[in-house]
Amino acid sequence: MTTLHSTPRADGFHMPAEWAPQTQTWMIWPERPDNWRLGGKPAQAAHVAVAKAIARFEPVTVAVSAGQYENARARLDVPNIRVVEMSSDDAWVRDTGPTFVINRSGEVRGVNWDFNAWGGFDGGLYSPWNRDSQIGGKILEIERAPRYCTEGFVLEGGSIHVDGEGTLITTEECLLNSNRNPHLDRAQIEAVLSANLAVDKIIWLPDGLFNDETDGHVDNFCCYVRPGEVLLAWTDDPQDPNYARCHAAMNVLQSSTDAQGRSFTVHKMPIPGPLYATEAECAGVDPVDGTQERNPTVRLAGSYVNFLIVNGGIIAPSFDDPLDSQAKAILQDLFPQHEVVMVPGRELLLGGGNIHCLTQQQPAPHKN
């Protein structure tokens, strides 16, 4: 594997928007019994549904442990899904995988961020995380893609969204959290993002969704629809703890312009629920010291914003909620050239995330 010691911006590379053409989507097979109930079996079924939905539109590669390889290979039984053996600590490839960058000469490289399980020993979700910290490099090696390393800089892919035209959206709750990069201030963090993603302007939303155990990842709260347009999780209920968060984000977006000088058009996506795990669902998770516990009294951070854009498709979660049909209609209206496919997302939510968190798109080479 080639490790580069420059930066993507210096070499003419940038992170493309999610709607740019893709060669494939990466996923990791869930099996961790102290995070996924019943040994991960319900989550694996949900994972299969997501992978097969994506495979209708583009190839999928699923990384799986040696112990689960035979099971995963048998269940992911469609030609467009590749299964590769790879050790991991959990399934969140959005956060553990590389961020792919491209240039205008048809090359694809990757940024290999540091990973500390969403906070390390200061609020992190599990320990150890050494196998997860190797995921980015392993994926890039399989793809023979040169990598840029950001040793000493912790970042999860779910904490950023870009428009491919110089603007990045994130949250202060996550990127300025003392359990990520306490040695860096806002300006220094912006400099790292600028150098590695070739962005020129960063929009800082104050917080993400209430009770998001990643410390407020933006991909569960606000995402780009196209340059200059975003989709924001929303509630009109003043009693909902998300109310202040949504309105604070709206204020920032309405008072900001992007790197191209455009004002933002903000579309609203209703928040489902409130959703909670049942006592039985929580009882199915193995209790282990140092791992995030599952509690039926704690509201789940369910969100329709946690969807994935693929070639010609939108893969979005449903929650058996009355708002499911409205969410699908909103997405179809915003993406008229894509087919919106809703996949049951409750089992994924019970593990702490959803479809966008569990996937990582690999952009296709761009050639002028």
Curated annotation (Swiss-Prot):
Keywords: Hydrolase, Polyamine biosynthesis. The keyword Plastid does not apply. GO terms for molecular function: agmatine deiminase activity; protein-arginine deiminase activity. NCBIfam families: agmatine_aguA, PRK13551.1. It is an enzyme of class 3 (hydrolase). Pfam families: PAD_porph. GO terms for biological process: putrescine biosynthetic process from arginine. SUPFAM superfamilies: Pentein. Belongs to the agmatine deiminase family. Pathway: Amine and polyamine biosynthesis; putrescine biosynthesis via agmatine pathway; N-carbamoylputrescine from agmatine: step 1/1. HAMAP family: Agmatine_deimin. It comes from the Bacteria. InterPro entries: Agmatine_deiminase, Peptidyl-Arg-deiminase_porph. It catalyses: agmatine + H2O = N-carbamoylputrescine + NH4(+). This is Agmatine deiminase. Homodimer. Its EC number is 3.5.3.12. The keyword Hydrolase applies. Mediates the hydrolysis of agmatine into N-carbamoylputrescine in the arginine decarboxylase (ADC) pathway of putrescine biosynthesis, a basic polyamine. The active site is at residue 357.
